[in-house]
């Protein structure tokens, strides 16, 4: 008996996503692929697998495999000894340990077994069309002549296609602005840039390296109580010792596409 997966088995939908049409939520399209059947005829085999059978890819940039359901059927009597190890692999990754998405083991005496994996990551549709996933099947301690088929595997997946996978980027934050005005967008942009870790690191590094009067600010032992160590010439301003202040130039924000949610995002 085949396992018919449900989207809810792999993905927790919010009330909004359950009620509203897909076009009005970020879950643009969630598809359940038709089955791909693998006939196992060797004690060990590595073969490509299509996890996206009949999943629409042409109109989208990315596809995410939310879950994969495997159903195995032993084609031998249930008193036979032995078992099988099934591993799902992302063949794009060269490191064997890192390329393994998940592994399942089943004994031949169980006759039928089912398991599911949750890869839960996106790939580009260009990569998806090249079938980046493989299944490694290793039958152990099952004494059967070569050329016979002791096991059949059926694979079904739940996938989501979308045109945008950057959920915490500036674009998503701008779209989330309720009041579409220039000031609001500028605030979002400023907050976003200020929160970026690389920007913080550069800003902190620059502050440590600033110098006043040829002396490093951080190494000046008088910087905390300058009034106690002010000399007669301390009020004389020297241009080379002054901190220069530059007024920020305002940059116009064009709203031709900003602030309008794309229908296929």
From Swiss-Prot:
Q: Where in the cell is it found?
A: Host cytoplasm, Host cytoskeleton; Host cell junction, Host plasmodesma
Cellular component terms (Gene Ontology): host cell cytoplasm; host cell plasmodesma; host cytoskeleton
Under Pfam families, the record lists:
MP
Q: Which GO terms describe its biological process?
A: transport of virus in host, cell to cell
The family database entries (InterPro entries) matched by this protein are listed as: TMV_movement, Viral_movement
Q: Does the keyword Transit peptide apply?
A: no
> Any coiled-coil ranges, and where?
none
Q: Where does this protein chiefly localize?
A: host cell
What GO annotations for molecular function exist for this entry? RNA binding
Annotated spans, Disordered: 216-248
Q: Where is the composition biased (Basic and acidic residues)?
A: 224-248
Keywords of the record, alphabetical order, are: Host cell junction, Host cytoplasm, Host cytoskeleton, RNA-binding, Transport, Viral movement protein
Free-text function comment from the UniProt entry = Transports viral genome to neighboring plant cells directly through plasmosdesmata, without any budding. The movement protein allows efficient cell to cell propagation, by bypassing the host cell wall barrier. Forms a ribonucleoprotein complex with viral RNA. Binds microtubules and modulates microtubule stability. Can bind double-stranded DNA.
UniProt lists the family membership as follows: Belongs to the tobamovirus movement protein family.
Q: What is this protein identified as?
A: Movement protein
This chain's source organism reads Ribgrass mosaic virus
